[in-house]
Structures are given as C-alpha cells and as structure tokens.
Amino acid sequence: ERLELLLSIFAKGERPSGSSDPYALRRAGNGLLQIVWDRGWRLDLSRFLGSAVEDWTALFPEFAIDSSALHQDLCQLLRQRIVSQLEDEGFAPDLVQAVSAESVATERLLSDPMDVRERLDLLNALRQSKALPALMAVVQRAARLAEKGDLVETDLNVSAVVSPERFESPSETAMYEVLVQLEPLASGRRYRD
C-alpha cells in the first residue's frame, strides 16, 4: 500500500518539498522502512523499486513515465527517510552519518536497509562500551593511508590489497592478521560475532 502510494504520486510528477507533503509521502516512506526493519527483511529496495517502476511503466504507457528518473527520485526519498528516521529514533547524528553519509552510494544504502540498521546498532554499542574511539582511530588511520594509494574504496578484500612483506613493525602484522580474521565476518554481515 505504501509503495503503491509512493509510485502513483511520484509517477504523476509530484514530490514532497520543504514542509509541503500533501499526500504524506514521507510518512509512507517511513512506514515502508519500518516494516522492513520490524520484520528483519533482507530486501534490496533499489532493485525492488526498479522492478516496480518498470511494471508501472509497462502498465501505464499513456503516462509517459521516465522510469530512470522515477526510480532515482524514489530511491533518493527513501535515502532521506532512512537518515531522518534513524535520527528521529535517537541515534547520534554522527553515527547515522557514518552508515549513511553522502559518500555511501544510494544503491549500497538501499541494497539492504536491515544491514544499515545493524551497522548502526553495532556502532552505537561500541560507543556505549567506550570501544568506539580506539576503533575510530584505527579506521581513520587506515582511511588516510588508503587515500594515498589507488585502492577502490569499496574493496574490502584485505589479502588482495595488502602486501604483508612490506610491513615494518609487528603492530602492522598484528593488524593485518586481525583484519584477515574479520573479513569473512564483515562480508557475511555478521557484525557481532
């Protein structure tokens, strides 16, 4: 129902703007996300929206729908709703930004909103346990080093991008070994193991 409302109003060319949202489209987006989170569904919303848009385009050719623009606009609305809803639930804005900043592709964000929620829950738990500052220091150092290189930022395969023979200290070797152990957990989205 919520998806149908979003599709139909967006297909008409109407969008929420500023404080104006006469069809409660933002609320429909929030409801859609809340259902996904409450049920724990692993749903690629971007792909799902893409299929729905293509179906609507085929069903209603008289509307002359620009399916690419419609898909992009719907994804952007849901991206904004993810950020807004997580902040409204009381998560710290810096943690919400850590999992959903503009540097995170919308496609990645919507490919599994449940994953976004789980990563945010993990960061929140790390902050509460006082372990987050130490982890942030390591991640920031690694990010600064990666910026100096030519790595693709989405490549998380440690053994493919790191040359242990170039290490100069035991701490580098220890860090590498930890990352190799964590890699299958991260790729399997098992953040708490």
Which role fits each region the language model picked out?
Residues 2-193:
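Amphipathic alpha-helical "coupling" segments that flank catalytic cores
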